[in-house]
């Protein structure tokens, strides 16, 4: 059975402009054929093995960042936090430009993710929602051999709430990929109504009716959402049909997905431990 996280559904259906459909396919194939894809990535040069005398600083960078992880709630804080950490890491004698480049990418990616997580708590408290993330919900499609699973953010009575923290005012908008993620939770939780709630600059956008920037309450039993939801199911089926054309002898073209200018996406030491993992490919590295 092929399993996909609900957070990856929009990309799998080709609706996420920031995450390629084939990349999600590669992730699932890496989980299924771990050693085969790891060996192939090593042969191509997508991952590199380093000798014992080469030092990496990713562990120290993560430790420095951990001081800020639980407290960041405002995108305006990002630049100062990044500067504080990079100033500290620059004091290390053996630090290289590559290490600093990795630090910048890791910090930027982590700040966005953790700011979103921390802001969810604020929104849930403000709006008096019932907090989610208390159990894993899943849905199994036996006909096409796939399972979706995930933890929802919150509920408001019978309405499933998906919270999105925006980094800029212009990002407060209706995104199709957010809608697809909500569809995934509705399917997994066996619910029919949901709402995408946005948060920016201490303002919660939670209109029940559609506006220029908000979907309002989504009801998959009523048009136009009913047809859109049916289309979503078809696209998910097509994704898994294509995924099943690959095997342990017929691999997906990795070089088409991970471009050469992004290599290496991780450095492996002599104990086979990965370091300097590219945040964009962290799930893939963790899968192998």
List the predicted regions and their residue ranges:
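Accessory terminal regions of nucleic-acid processing enzymes
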Residues: 1-288
């Amino acid at each position: 059975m092929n399993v996909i996280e609900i957070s990856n559904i929009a990309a799998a259906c080709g609706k996420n402009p920031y995450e390629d459909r084939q990349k999600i396919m590669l992730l699932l194939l890496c989980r299924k054929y771990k050693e085969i894809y790891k060996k192939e990535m090593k042969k191509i040069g997508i991952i590199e093995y380093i000798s014992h005398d080469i030092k990496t600083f990713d562990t120290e960078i993560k430790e420095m960042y951990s001081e800020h992880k639980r407290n960041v709630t405002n995108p305006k804080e990002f630049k100062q936090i990044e500067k504080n950490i990079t100033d500290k890491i620059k004091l290390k004698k053996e630090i290289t430009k590559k290490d600093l480049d990795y630090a910048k990418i890791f910090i930027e990616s982590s700040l966005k993710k953790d700011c979103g997580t921390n802001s969810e708590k604020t929104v849930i408290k403000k709006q008096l929602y019932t907090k989610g993330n208390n159990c894993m919900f899943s849905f199994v499609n036996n006909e096409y051999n796939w399972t979706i699973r995930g933890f929802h953010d919150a509920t408001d009575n019978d309405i499933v709430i998906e919270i999105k923290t925006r980094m800029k005012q212009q990002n407060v908008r209706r995104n199709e990929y957010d809608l697809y993620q909500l569809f995934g939770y509705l399917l997994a939780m066996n619910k029919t109504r949901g709402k995408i709630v946005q948060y920016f600059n201490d303002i919660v956008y939670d209109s029940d009716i559609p506006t220029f920037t908000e979907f309002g309450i989504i009801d998959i039993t009523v048009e136009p959402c009913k047809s859109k939801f049916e289309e979503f199911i078809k696209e998910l089926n097509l994704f898994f049909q294509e995924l099943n054309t690959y095997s342990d002898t017929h691999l997906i073209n990795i070089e088409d997905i991970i471009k050469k200018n992004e290599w290496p996406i991780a450095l492996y030491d002599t104990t086979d431990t990965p370091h300097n993992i590219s945040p964009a490919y962290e799930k893939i590295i963790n899968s192998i």
